[in-house]
Design a protein with these regions (language model features):
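A generic structural signal for tightly packed, nonpolar segments enriched in small/aliphatic residues
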Residues: 1-208
Length: 208
């Protein structure tokens, strides 16, 4: 969860920063869901990983052009310091390997692009498993969430000359998809079932 997001050195304008204390919305959803499941399923083997940071401006803040090493040793070129949430999620996804999961679910208020594409009522979700997608579509909530494609061809937008991957594409296109593709690169093993839910659609509500 990003407890407050200024955008870092790629600073957000004031009107975009006003309610960025809500950028921990994905973490809040994950914690609430975890507590509900643990309460009703006493023998549940569910595990919760919450990476936490504040994205601020300081003398040691990450800078555009920096190269960071992730938990799985992949290197990441920082092209935009306001694409920080995916850096936290990347390490959390890799760390999930410690629990040998059959399914990984992540929640994040990750991209404005998801809300631009689907509006304020439909969170986008991505999955590498059609079986998982079928289960989502079979629920009563299937009309309230929308599957988006993991279009692998867009990985070319994430290429770096100095690192394994960039943290954000520079052309501004397909921002939600490229963010999901970035996360996919940090799954602990390729065959693990995974679903990424971009909850930024809901973030416009001041009640959140």
């Amino acid at each position: 969860g990003v407890t407050f997001d200024t955008g870092g050195l790629n600073l957000k304008p004031g009107n975009s920063m006003r309610y960025m204390k809500k950028d921990m919305g994905g973490a809040a959803i994950a914690i609430a869901l975890f507590l509900i499941i643990k309460n009703y399923l006493k023998k549940s083997k569910i595990k919760l990983i919450i990476p936490i940071a504040e994205n601020s401006v300081s003398s040691n803040a990450m800078r555009p052009g920096d190269v960071l090493k992730s938990f799985n040793n992949k290197t990441i070129e920082i092209t935009n310091t306001d694409a920080e949430g995916r850096l936290l999620l990347a390490d959390a996804l890799t760390r999930a390997e410690l629990f040998n999961p059959k399914l990984i679910i992540d929640f994040a208020t990750l991209t404005g692009a998801a809300r631009a594409a689907l509006g304020e009522d439909l969170p986008a979700y991505y999955t590498n498993s059609n079986e998982v997608a079928k289960k989502v579509e079979s629920t009563v909530y299937s009309k309230s969430i929308w599957r988006m494609p993991l279009h692998d061809a867009y990985m070319q937008k994430m290429q770096s000359d100095v690192a394994d991957i960039v943290n954000a594409s520079s052309d501004g296109m397909a921002g939600s998809i490229t963010a999901a593709l970035f996360l996919k690169e940090f799954l602990p093993y390729k065959k693990v079932n995974w679903i990424h839910i971009d909850t930024y659609a809901w973030s416009s509500s001041f009640l959140n």
